Amino acid sequence: MKPITAILIISILLLSGCGSSYEFRETGDLEDADISPDEFASLIPDYSDSLRTLSGSGRAFISEPGRSDRITVDFHSDRQASLVTFRNRIGIEGGELLVEDDSVLIYNRIDRVAEKIALHDASLSEIGSLATINLVDLFNYPVKRSAIDDVFQDNSYYVAETDDGRQITIDRETGHVLDIQMPPGSGAPYSRINYEAYEYLNGFYLPRKITIFSMDGDTRVSLLVRQLQTNLSLPALEIQIPDGIPIITL
């Protein structure tokens, strides 16, 4: 895989040629839930005020038609920006990715190329557009009560349908978000996010494995988190690009 392609895929934020333990089900196969939308929302841990920063490292497994790859990643994120550094299998740093509110800056150290892309610009590839996900929001997916229309259930899960057509699946016992399914034609850069292996860390229940699927379903990227720290003081969330390397705006 070319380094620049790997960076773009990492911008999915972070993620499995590996399978998922939760198998998606249509709500037509489920029964109406015995809880209200308010109760559904209250079951989900909400760290929007208390979880301010994340720092960690892990391994990203990338799977797309005809190829797969494995990359080591280090990341730092607050709620405004996310900085990701990745290395190849032999430990050579390949590049950095900085995701901000309206753009993603990609620096390919191997090819010495820097590109800045508007998050919602038409020139951003489908894979690259997955960079729109902030890491703190990715680890603690925000769910607004006002967006929930209906709730369904089976013996293990509650599934909510939102006013924009998303389906949000949570574990009935823990309230942990397990799966986010986007409707066709939603305009989102991904079709599905899957969460596994929650652990308790410094007052937060956070997933240790996250898988994101591209909109066409052909590409999957999974992050297996090895180390994770919360609410630390972060280094500057910026990329130091050497003099003489222009930033190409696409």
Each predicted region: which residue ranges?
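Sec-dependent bacterial lipoprotein signal peptides
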Residues: 1-18
